[in-house]
Amino acid sequence: MQKNIVSKGYEKMAENKKLITADNSFLTYMGRIDFSDKTRPEFYYAGSNVKMTFTGTSVSAVIKNHKYFNIQELGFVIDGKEGKVTFDKNDEDITLDIACDLEKGTHTVTLFKRQDASHYFEFVGFEIDPDGEVLENPPLPARKIECYGDSVSAGAVCEAVDFVASCDPEDHQGVYDNAWHSYAMITARNLGAQIHNIAQGGIAIFDNTGYYHAPNYIGMESVYNKLCYFPEGAKGVTPWDFENYTPDVVLFAVGQNDPHNEGHEDFDIADPDYRAKWKNAYKSIILDLRSKYPNATFVLLLTVLCHGEEWDKAVDEIANELNDQKITHFMFTRTGKATPGHPRLPEQYEMAEELTAYLSNMGDKIWG
């Protein structure tokens, strides 16, 4: 859990640098990313990343950012040390300085999207020394995970470690968000798996509920099968081709935000009519995913963020009613009880440890 976070600045595209373009075959990508223009892939989802192995003493990333709200930051890991870069230039190509004065030799850098839909960006490439070289990465892990979730799965406010078991700090502007340390992405690293993290803060199952994309709220029923999932993108909302990625394990962690009904009384999962409606919509998503992933293991869950236990009971009912041995309901030791604010780093790692153990206990048979 120990991290080395260092903010860096930005500069215009530098001279006397070698640009490793985004379509270089030695770069490795992970996440639900738009490759319709391979020279400028677009990153929408929290945790999506690109990795490069290179020689030289410096590295920068060239991007074009599209901001919607919050302070804009990207994360990186270079030679095992994590950092972040903060910037405020949008709608033009900029170069983000990641590292300089590295020792001569071989280095590895991963650039990742820390935040969810506060922005998206086009990745143009990495800049390295003029005499530097890009080297082939090791292959991606064979194991594959996909997570559908909300702000907890996206790592929202997880770095506000002075607020453990407390409400979120006011007006934090996204600076504590870090998808790299969401329980889902930690679990994937623990298990040596790839992950596509389809997580968005505030999202509920239904459209017009929850907190995401006010005042025209968008739910997971309209997001789970999308590439760009918000209409403000340059291409608008775009479909995802499920042939591009087939997970061995699907985590489905939606339900935390579902009581919210803006301008009206909250939805009550104890109400029989609403419970049936909500469960049917939840099942519809799972069954559609099951049709696309016939061999996957599905784990239905809610997180340690405080919520009423009736929501956990409803998820348990769904798992039982689907009557599929490879669809299970998992509860953390402190599901719904740990914190009134977003889980911080200790709680994210607590969840990851328990989920890692749960999946490990299923044995190698769950992996393709």
What is each of the regions a protein language model found here?
Residues 144-148, 153, 195-199, 248-253, ...:
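Structural recognition of the beta-strand scaffold that forms the well-ordered cores
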Residues 46-47, 169-271, 305-309, 346:
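Conserved SGNH/GDSL esterase-like catalytic core that processes O-acyl groups on lipids
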Residues 135-138, 236-246, 287-292, 364-367:
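Surface-exposed acidic, glycine-flexible loop patches that form ligand/cofactor-binding
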Residues 183-194, 285-297, 319-324:
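A structural motif corresponding to the C-terminal end of an alpha-helix
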Residues 251-260, 282-317:
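Active-site segments of SGNH/GDSL-like serine hydrolases
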Residues 297-368:
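Extracellular serine-dependent O-acyl
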Residues 1-179, 363-368:
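N-terminal secretory targeting modules
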